[in-house]
UniProtKB/Swiss-Prot annotation:
It catalyses: N-acetyl-L-glutamate + ATP = N-acetyl-L-glutamyl 5-phosphate + ADP. It comes from Methanosarcina acetivorans (strain ATCC 35395 / DSM 2834 / JCM 12185 / C2A). SUPFAM superfamilies: Carbamate kinase-like. Belongs to the acetylglutamate kinase family. ArgB subfamily. This is Acetylglutamate kinase. The keyword ATP-binding applies. One of its GO terms (biological process) is L-arginine biosynthetic process. The gene is argB.
Amino acid sequence: MELKRENVLIEALPYMQEFYDSIMVIKVGGNAMVSTQIMEDIIKDIVLLRYVGIKPVIVHGGGPEITEKMERMGKKAEFFQGLRITDDETMEIARMVLVGNINTKIVSLIGIFGGKGVGFTGYDGRMILGHKQAVKRVLVDGVETEVDIGWVGESEVINPEILHIMLEKSYIPVISPIAVDAKGNALNINADTVAGDIAAALKAKKLILMTDVSGLLRNIKDPSSRISRVNLDQIDSLIEEGIISGGMIPKIKGAAVAVKSGVERAHVINGSVSHSMLLELFTDGGVGTMLYGPDHPPV
């Protein structure tokens, strides 16, 4: 039975009180940005969070757009173990798409809906310092072969000072997942990883990962089989059972690292479902999967 509007608001009140003045890091996936309507709904929700006293930080991806741009420029996208092989030209295309297109678009939408957005990359304030990933070694026909995946990086240090300054001034930071190494080279880093690292550095209350599925499902074909809560100790067994599989494995593992590093809880939700973030945060049942550790068990 559909809840009356006043009941929805009353149900949300204790959550709003609990989350007031807290930091939440929200990772918006590239798939969510394919649809203008979905993107607008997400940004409206994030601006609303700011207006009820929550301090949101956005980390965005852009994989589909980068691939599309590469194809238009006549360059084939290549991947190795899920990582985009990033040569010099691909790195420039990634920067063009992430910083010049997606980041700017999100900041603009925040302004349209009444918020104050400001865009960043890891270069700004040397926010994300990283290093290039090591050359990969694989067996091809029984022969060990080296694979250089290019300017794909891992973060080493997050300097959150500039983010704290912006949050205190009521800005909503929007971060492109591009880091910088000790020599000033740009590095392409997985956006889920960046979001988790930034959430840990900011001591965020929540890490929210927007995907194209409604959290973890015991049966991928049955939305009603959603697992609403997962203890960190359950993750390995869920991977063994195949419930956590494919691209969800690095997302969940990254979220687990963030929780172990001080983030209270992490949430995996379907960003393509209208207002899913508000429903996950402000209703008792939620609509996604919440990850928690021993320090912050569900009440």
